[in-house]
Amino acid sequence: MSKPFYVRFEVPPELAEKAYEALRKARESGGKIKKGTNETTKAVDKGLAKLVLIAEDVDPPEIVAHLPLLCEEKKIPYVYVPSKKKLGEAAGIEVQAAAAAIIDPGAAKDLVEEIIKEVEQIKAKAGL
């Protein structure tokens, strides 16, 4: 199955796993996260997000299609993850999440920085 139109670069599975882990770790260590498209959009709009996670299996894709562009505009790093179900679990909710944002990484600070560096390298190779 091809990727939805809003996915601008390929994220390796191990990087996606790191992103889930960073979200989980930030939440569990007293950091601050936002869950869901609306909260994530507001956090990006206000420039509060340190890292945005966007699920690739969102239907309809228009729900999150604005997020990569908004993140680019606000210079906020973002990463794609394959599953909205796993994203919801990592965010600590019992439902799926199309998107999430790490506001304060807490104990996941180093992991978040590592993810941002990897994403920047992937985007540079993709010419973005």
Swiss-Prot record:
InterPro entries: eL8/uL1-like, Ribosomal_eL30-like_sf, Ribosomal_eL8-like_CS, Ribosomal_eL8/eL30/eS12/Gad45, Ribosomal_eL8/Nhp2, Ribosomal_eL8_arc. Keywords: Cytoplasm, Ribonucleoprotein, Ribosomal protein, RNA-binding, rRNA-binding, tRNA processing. Multifunctional RNA-binding protein that recognizes the K-turn motif in ribosomal RNA, the RNA component of RNase P, box H/ACA, box C/D and box C'/D' sRNAs. GO terms for biological process: ribosome biogenesis; translation; tRNA 5'-leader removal. This is Large ribosomal subunit protein eL8. Gene3D superfamilies: 3.30.1330.30. One of its GO terms (cellular component) is ribosome. It is found in: Cytoplasm. It comes from Ignicoccus hospitalis (strain KIN4/I / DSM 18386 / JCM 14125). The gene is rpl7ae.
